[in-house]
């Protein structure tokens, strides 16, 4: 069987920005991640071994000179030594992985080790599982490249004609690397055509979160951070201070760059109650990844106004399992309120004829700040009950504490 991940940078930008943040703030931290399949999929017999073979192959995948040159040129907020010394020397270590499969076919995947190292596994695990399943269940054999390009092209025209500012964030649950590349080609071509037809009076293609494909296509690369930074910080400084402390530490590391903050890890109230004007000014916007988008827009706009900030100077990035129709609804709601943009994943990169996308994630479940300290459970609550992940006892405890604080 073909190898699925063949490029070191076939990963999302936030993996690298978070990795550098970790090296600066928690270089000795250790973490454990767990794979969650929200559909409780029963995988084919032997899938665990096939997946392990795919992931062990990554031990031979290293960053190339071309990739280092691209990252050095494109990401000035990442220092030269990080890209050209640290990443050059980085090697995937499959000993960090534990992969098992029960008699019913359910997968149990754990990643455990130094945080700066284990963070690299999330995207490869998810994209390998997704593509491997589409190969094994026959979806890949039925795939019609010309037809799927045409469908993506028409989607693109709809996006740009409706005025959406949008980029691809579909690495983790994509149909395949080749399909993600084909989708990006279609988005580029449709954007160029609509832009020409309208003299630029249309939406905007903001690029892709995938570093490798941004390099191949010479387009912008999107991404800032992930929930795990806040989830880990909670075990250090508590649920009421973790958002502020990550904002402060992130701004110390990046000095105003990569400034979209993902605020919903423990719900919206605890974030907005502790958002200072300095932090709101430092970050260029907020990413909405859960909750009812219109309600979240109202909360964000009101908070900015309370702080004396014009919301139209700030950005709201929407990324909560969107399709194009839903993005258009949100866009119309945002007009005159806040500057909006969209990151769309599965609906672009796994919306393939007669194919059911996976509903899978890899999340941080435990952490400790050094190898000599005790382990603590790491959880994520979000603004959607369906997205709550982690140790149930801790989730219940934090929810009770937050509910009591809001009374």
Language-model features: where?
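Ordered alpha/beta subdomains of enzyme catalytic regions
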Residues: 1-246, 251-252, 361-407
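Glycine-rich phosphate/ribose-binding loops and adjacent secondary-structure elements
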Residues: 2, 217-407
């Amino acid at each position: 069987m073909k190898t699925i991940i063949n490029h070191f940078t076939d990963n999302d930008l936030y993996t690298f920005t978070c990795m550098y943040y970790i090296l600066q703030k928690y270089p000795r931290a250790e973490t454990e991640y767990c794979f969650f399949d929200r559909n409780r999929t029963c995988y084919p017999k032997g899938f665990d071994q096939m997946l392990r073979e795919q992931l062990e192959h990554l031990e031979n995948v290293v960053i190339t000179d071309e990739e280092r040159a691209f990252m050095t040129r494109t990401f000035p907020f990442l220092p030269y030594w990080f890209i050209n010394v640290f990443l050059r020397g980085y090697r995937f270590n499959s000993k960090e992985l534990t992969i098992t499969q029960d008699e019913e076919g359910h997968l149990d995947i754990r990643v455990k080790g130094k945080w700066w190292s284990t963070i690299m596994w999330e995207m490869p695990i998810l994209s390998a599982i997704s593509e491997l399943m589409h190969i094994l269940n026959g979806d890949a054999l039925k795939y019609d490249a010309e037809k799927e390009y045409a469908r993506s092209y028409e989607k693109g025209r709809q996006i740009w004609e409706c005025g959406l500012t949008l980029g691809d964030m579909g690495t983790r649950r994509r149909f395949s690397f080749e399909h993600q590349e084909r989708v990006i080609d279609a988005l580029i071509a449709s954007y160029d055509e609509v832009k020409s037809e309208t003299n630029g009076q249309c939406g905007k293609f903001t690029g892709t979160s995938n570093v490798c494909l941004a390099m191949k296509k010479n387009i912008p690369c999107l991404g800032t951070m992930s929930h795990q930074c806040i989830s880990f910080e909670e075990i250090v400084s508590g649920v009421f201070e973790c958002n502020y402390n990550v904002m402060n530490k992130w701004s110390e590391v990046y000095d105003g760059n990569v400034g979209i903050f993902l605020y919903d890890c423990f719900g919206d109230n605890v974030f907005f109650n502790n958002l200072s004007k300095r932090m709101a000014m430092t970050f260029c916007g907020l990413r909405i990844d859960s909750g009812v988008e219109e309600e979240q827009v109202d909360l964000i706009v009101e908070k900015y106004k309370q702080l004396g900030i014009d919301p139209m100077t700030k950005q709201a990035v929407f990324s909560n399992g969107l399709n194009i129709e839903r993005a258009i609804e949100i866009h119309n709601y945002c007009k005159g309120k806040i500057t909006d943009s969209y990151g769309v994943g599965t609906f672009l990169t796994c919306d393939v004829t007669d194919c059911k996308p996976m509903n899978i994630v890899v999340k941080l479940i435990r952490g400790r700040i050094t190898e000599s300290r005790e382990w603590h459970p790491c959880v994520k609550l979000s603004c959607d009950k369906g997205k709550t992940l982690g140790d149930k006892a801790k989730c219940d405890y934090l929810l009770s504490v937050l509910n009591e604080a809001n009374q």
